[in-house]
């Protein structure tokens, strides 16, 4: 056995992890740097449709239900993007419609958060509340079939209000964003959703008992499968190589 060769091999093997760790030591990127990379590899020509769906449902202890939804779909055939609002409701079979007696205080700064802000504040018993934000990206190269745009057309600066079984529904379009809310009957609480200015807010206040609330906002993006040309690919590869010098 050649002892010197074995010793050389062991020394090389032991040094490789240390060398790799020093060459590819990760560093933390700031929020500003991440913002510069956001969407970098989704070329504008590949996005063939974009849509937003928002919905809020409130069901009280008696089974009374109110649902409000707003949706917008944009593709190559869209002339003027706008939201369409629908509201439905049904009366439950229960008899428990006692007024809520809970009190929720504070929260004045919740509407000034950046990014996605989700809150549930409760002063009752047996309540259930969900806040959901989803992003659905499809790459099949086909735009989703145009859903018949029905309901109330919400113009910029306009609003929509109606009474429903479980509460009063309101939707408004202001300052480049959309806000929807349900103010539940009998002091049971309220639910709010708001999107605009790069921020999403979802909040629920529960002052009664045995309520079920669901807030949902979903962004839908469809990408074409035509791919990137050679120039765009080289540009993206050069950007990735640039990260190598920073430790990636």
UniProtKB/Swiss-Prot annotation:
Keywords: Amyloid, Cell adhesion, Fimbrium, Secreted, Signal. One of its GO terms (biological process) is cell adhesion. It is found in: Fimbrium; Secreted. A minor component of purified amyloid fibrils. Fibrils are resistant to boiling in 2% (weight/vol) SDS and require >90% (vol/vol) formic acid to dissolve. Disruption phenotype: Deletion of just fapE in an overexpressing strain yields cells without amyloid fibrils. Deletion of the entire fapA-fapF six-gene locus shows no visible growth phenotype. This is Functional amyloid sbunit FapE. The lineage of its organism: Bacteria, Pseudomonadati, Pseudomonadota, Gammaproteobacteria, Pseudomonadales. Belongs to the FapE family. Residues 1-20 form the signal peptide. GO terms for cellular component: extracellular region; pilus. A minor component of the functional amyloid in this bacterium. Upon overexpression of the endogenous six-gene locus (fapA-fapF) in situ, cells form large clumps during liquid growth, make large amounts of biofilm and produce amyloid fibrils. Expression of the 6 gene operon in E.coli strain BL21(DE3) induces flocculation and biofilm formation with copious extracellular fibrils.
């Amino acid at each position: 056995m050649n002892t010197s060769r074995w010793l050389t091999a062991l020394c090389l093997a032991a040094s490789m992890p240390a060398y790799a760790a020093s060459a590819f030591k990760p560093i933390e990127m700031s929020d500003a740097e991440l913002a510069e990379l956001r969407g970098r590899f989704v070329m504008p020509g590949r996005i063939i449709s974009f849509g937003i769906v928002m919905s809020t449902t409130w069901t009280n202890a008696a089974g009374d239900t109110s649902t409000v939804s707003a949706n917008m779909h944009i593709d190559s055939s869209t002339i003027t993007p706008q939201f369409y609002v629908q509201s439905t409701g049904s009366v439950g079979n229960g008899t428990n419609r006692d007024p809520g007696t809970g009190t929720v205080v504070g929260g004045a700064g919740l509407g000034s958060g950046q990014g996605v802000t989700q809150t549930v504040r409760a002063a009752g018993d047996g309540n259930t509340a969900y806040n959901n934000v989803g992003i659905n990206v499809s790459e099949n190269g086909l735009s989703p079939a145009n859903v018949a745009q029905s309901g109330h057309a919400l113009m910029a600066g306009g609003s929509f209000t109606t009474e429903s079984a479980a509460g009063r529904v309101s939707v408004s379009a202001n300052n480049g964003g959309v806000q929807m809310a349900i103010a539940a009957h009998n002091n049971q609480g309220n639910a709010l959703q708001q999107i605009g200015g790069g921020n999403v807010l979802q909040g629920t206040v529960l002052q009664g008992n045995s309520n079920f609330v669901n807030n949902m906002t979903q962004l839908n993006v469809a990408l074409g499968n035509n791919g990137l040309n050679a120039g765009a690919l080289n540009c993206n590869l050069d950007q990735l190589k640039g990260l190598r010098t920073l430790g990636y």
